[in-house]
């Protein structure tokens, strides 16, 4: 993994580590929402929701555009797919490691018998 892809993974997983951000992402993946409409859904200030949206945007999980005075957010499906791809790769690595541990344990058991 290059430094750039590691930084990207860090940003993605940091953004997804928060429950509110995951919920915001779920909403904007379903359709475009204004930031003010999103803010009403949460028991926090408008500014706090803006900050959550900014983290998601920085990670590339959503995009914003202006429509008059409103900022509209839309989820970026390709970024979510890249997260799934990263998790699949990590799963493959760990399954390989576990398989090697199983072989070592079986080998140890054979030597003890």
Tell where the protein language model's regions lie, with residue ranges.
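C-terminal regulatory/oligomerization modules of transcriptional regulators
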Residues: 1-8, 27-41, 46, 55-58, ...
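Pre-recognition alpha-helix immediately N-terminal to the DNA-recognition helix
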Residues: 11, 22-24
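Short helix-coil-helix linker/hinge
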Residues: 15-20, 80
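Histidine-centered divalent metal-coordination motifs
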Residues: 21, 52
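Short, Lys/Arg-rich nucleic-acid/phosphate-binding segment
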Residues: 66-72
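Conserved catalytic core of two-component histidine kinases
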Residues: 75
């Amino acid at each position: 993994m290059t430094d750039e892809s590691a930084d990207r993974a860090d940003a993605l997983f940091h953004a997804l580590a928060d429950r509110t951000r995951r919920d915001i992402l779920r909403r904007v993946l379903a359709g475009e929402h204004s930031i003010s409409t999103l803010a009403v859904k949460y028991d926090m200030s408008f500014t706090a929701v803006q900050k959550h949206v900014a983290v998601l945007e920085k990670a590339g999980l959503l995009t914003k555009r202006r429509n008059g005075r409103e900022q509209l957010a839309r989820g970026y499906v390709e970024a979510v797919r890249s997260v799934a791809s990263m998790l699949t790769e990590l799963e493959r690595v760990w399954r390989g490691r576990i398989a090697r541990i199983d072989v070592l344990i079986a080998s140890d058991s054979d030597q003890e018998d």
